[in-house]
Amino acid sequence: MSKAFKLTSKFKPSGDQPQAIEKLVAGLEDGLAYQTLLGVTGSGKTFTIANAIEKVQRPTLILEPNKTLAAQFYAEMREFFPENAVEYFVSYYDYYQPEAYVPSSDTYIEKDASINDHIEQMRLSATKAITERHDTIIIATVSAIYGLGDPDSYLKMLLHLTRGDQIDQRKILQRLAELQYTRNDLELRRATYRVNGDIIDIYPADSEREAVRVELFDDEVENLSYFDPLTGEMLRRVPRITVYPKTHYVTPREKLLSTLDQIKIELKERLSQLEKANKLVERQRLEQRTKFDMEMILELGYCSGIENYSRYLSGRNEGEPPPTLIDYLPKDALLIIDESHVTIPQLGGMYRGDRARKETLVEYGFRLPSALDNRPLRFDEFEKLAPQTIFISATPGPYEEKQSDQVVELLVRPTGLIDPEIEVRPVATQVDDLLSEIKKRAAQNERVLVTTLTKRMAEDLTEYFTEHNVRVRYLHSDIDTVERVEIIRDLRLGVFDVLVGINLLREGLDIPEVSLVAILDADKEGFLRSERSLIQTMGRAARNVHGKAILYADRITDSMKRAMEEAERRRIAQSAYNEKHHITPKSIQKAVTEIIEGARTYTERGRFVNQAQLIAEEESKYIAMTPKQLAKELRKLEEQMYHHARNLEFEEAAAVRDKIQHIRKGLLEVKE
């Protein structure tokens, strides 16, 4: 059921925000295809966009350059729109090794992937929301331009049930099998169902914590209700329900059969070509692999790598763009590209890398030529499909500057914070000078970001600072997304004072505690020291009232000059605003919260809690007990362990067993 977008916030637009909202909304209503929101760090770009969405009342897709920023934006939008559908659509792979062939060493690398079940559920929830509700905001990464199942086929496969319907139980079970749900009478999990007499319990693939109960009386649907799959408690009765498929790649049976006919025709043509070219090994390989896939599709309705036949499954012609998340959007949707100076080049680069890999697979008989149409969108195709667009960036790139019909500036921060003061200091003494600056900041409980040009320099610097009793960490490209978020969180909490990095301390890092940004070798002109990179890096200190940026350089390059001039322009605009409205700058106060749900565990009561905190709390509880109480607690835990084992819940039983061993080893020794 759709509602109107309703923004919930204790803040009202202030500073440059009211005029920016007004201009963006007017631009959308006037039909401008592209607009740019040029917003300085800490000016409230997210809040401005949220207000614009509320005013235009249009479903919105927001593209982010990486999962970290997508999670940050998702958390903020959920706070702003608690009553609306705010969804998250990113790649569901924790690990992904694409199928590839290396001719030089005759090495075939099979596709290998580990899918994150929770993110898969969120992706399915996103497409469900956008098809059912107008009040939907989806936060996505470039995953949104990769091929997804055809929306028409997907929507044809929905299972609709209404109270009073005449339908045979076998027919419902057959439809669930077509939706790729599996029967599991022991444990009800996502995308499974169980049958108990005339009652069918279904756990929808897109649902996080609600299952569906279908009660039949003979061949009539007598009752439909939602229940908690963990406790079995009934939540509410409903007059009708819709069950969505387990995957975006489900296809009606008749379409599968016509797909097999088309694959046969293409296979015959391709085998003939390979035979004429005397590529007999490739011919045999292709025939064997394709026939195996066809057999699987005929029997099960899918096969491993079914996406390679997506041209036929979605009924497209050769070379036509694949269906993507953008095809699921309604006609009046709005597209917002955050950190556009990074996201736009990403969108442009996806197609080429994918194409090169697949051409090798086709040439050596691992795939049919139609597999080349299982691909991300080309940039020109993305442009044609994209609805009205707003770019967001503190440093818009050349594409945005060229395309935008209007640039809306957001230079004034409501907090009164002025762009960091910039100083240029000589390179010769940069390390020792920086060390003395760090000690000053650490004494005031403030944090420091240091950016270097090379990995070696970052490592050496970290080692040097550690020797001088500085609490320092080094952020490098080998650190995964969740760990990176944890390091930034520790920096904010004061676990350490200095974070050293290369190109990782840029877009969207929201760390109000940072009062100093040091850029080493700032005069080495190049990508890492371009005007945009310098503005973005210096902006990390713009959320603190004592913000300062030190550029270590022996000369002022053109990039430095332009970056410093832009910072000065922004400082003048902010100072004039502060003077006019009698504002005293204040540092941004922001609670340190978890933004990535993967770093948390879901408890039975529906709350997310930090895993480490959970263990620490448990331990402190047992330490406080007397030996008698501890023995009683151990007996209780043993009963719990046997109960899980009797119910075949072996994972839960193992977890309780480990807890018992931990108490016996650690805590009982301490007590003795």
Swiss-Prot record:
Subunit structure, as described in the record: Forms a heterotetramer with UvrA during the search for lesions. Interacts with UvrC in an incision complex.
Any one GO CC term of the record: cytoplasm
Segments forming domain Helicase ATP-binding: 26-181
Keywords for this protein: ATP-binding, Cytoplasm, DNA damage, DNA excision, DNA repair, Excision nuclease, Helicase, Hydrolase, Nucleotide-binding, SOS response
Protein name: UvrABC system protein B
PANTHER family found in the cross-reference section: UVRABC SYSTEM PROTEIN B
Function: The UvrABC repair system catalyzes the recognition and processing of DNA lesions. A damage recognition complex composed of 2 UvrA and 2 UvrB subunits scans DNA for abnormalities. Upon binding of the UvrA(2)B(2) complex to a putative damaged site, the DNA wraps around one UvrB monomer. DNA wrap is dependent on ATP binding by UvrB and probably causes local melting of the DNA helix, facilitating insertion of UvrB beta-hairpin between the DNA strands. Then UvrB probes one DNA strand for the presence of a lesion.
Pfam families: Helicase_C (PF00271), ResIII (PF04851), UVR (PF02151), UvrB (PF12344), UvrB_inter (PF17757)
NCBIfam families reported for this sequence: PRK05298.1, uvrb
Domain of life: Bacteria
